[in-house]
Amino acid sequence: MMVMERRSDIESDSVVSERPVISINESENYNLRICSNVVSLPIESIDVGMEITHLGSGSRGNSVLLSTSESNVLIDCGFSLKGIEQRLGKLGIIPDEIDSILVTHHHSDHSKSAKRAALKWGSNLISNAETAKRMEWEGSVSLRVFSELERIDAGPDISLLTVPVPHDDAENVAVIACDDQGRRAAVVTDLGEVTTELVSHLKKCEHISIEANYDHDRLMRGGYPDSLKRRISGRGGHLSNYQTAKALGEIVHPNLSSIVLCHLSESNNLPHMAESEVLMEICDSFRGSLSISKQEGPEFSHWLGQSDPERISV
């Protein structure tokens, strides 16, 4: 009753009743007149930082989403088209919002649905000449071919620098992403050795996603043929937990806020083994967050350039 009396008092107030009474038929035109008096002001885009999200990582598929204020870019597209779209959907990303897809090399776990995705979504497809040749992309899709150490504009406010790395017979590249505020994030997988060139670039990054593919003892005791063991552990293979730990020990710097260990072998590694090996090497110098990216993602995102916690569960 008190609320009803209060509303009655307000409705009888002569000041409130000064607004003109408008019939239903007139209301639309009245609203248009009111809106026409509003002065449009330029809206500045809000800097939300750079978001790094692993959609999944491992021998059955790899893809990383980089999001900024105005751009969405995929590094690799190694799942089925349906699988990629489902993963993006969990993040609230409409596939048509993907500006570019950069494929690091031709192996299926990195390139599987890249062409189909680019055609369906209207995204730019980016690769080096060797990958484009092996995948037979030339002339069948809108393709941007890059050279070694070339910086590519992948979206309105993000560029990608490609750094060659040794891996089998593939012309593989590591990717250094840079937004318009100068923040850098690296995605580094499928390499048997961390080169001096790569180290120099990683020392400038605030986020590093890097593979820790196998535990050496576990690989050697496992059931793989000796030839495959040699390939995996060779210069053109993958990084072991030990190699990754040693590389990060050299790379870690005060501005490095997050590390993700990725592309872990399901047969020759375990998450806690990779994590403990790396922590033993960097625990005295690294104060950021260390995470493991698994095959079935997305599980979490990392943010650069925000005051919020850098790791956010998806």
Walk through the language-model features, giving the residues of each:
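Cap/insert and terminal regions of metallo-dependent hydrolase folds
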Residues: 196-294
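Active-site neighborhood of phospho(di)ester-bond hydrolases with catalytic His/Asp-centered motifs
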Residues: 75-78, 99-106, 126-129, 186-189, ...
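Structured catalytic core of nucleotide-sugar glycosyltransferases
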Residues: 53-63, 106-114, 132, 136, ...
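Conserved beta-strand hairpin/beta-sheet module of binuclear metal-dependent hydrolase folds
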Residues: 18, 29-91, 173-190, 207
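Metallo-beta-lactamase
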Residues: 34, 128-182
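Active-site metal-binding loops of divalent metal-dependent hydrolases
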Residues: 56-57, 77-79, 106, 165-168, ...
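C-terminal regulatory/interaction regions
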Residues: 3-9, 13, 18-22, 26-30, ...
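Active-site metal-binding motif and surrounding structural segment of the metallo-beta-lactamase
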Residues: 81-127
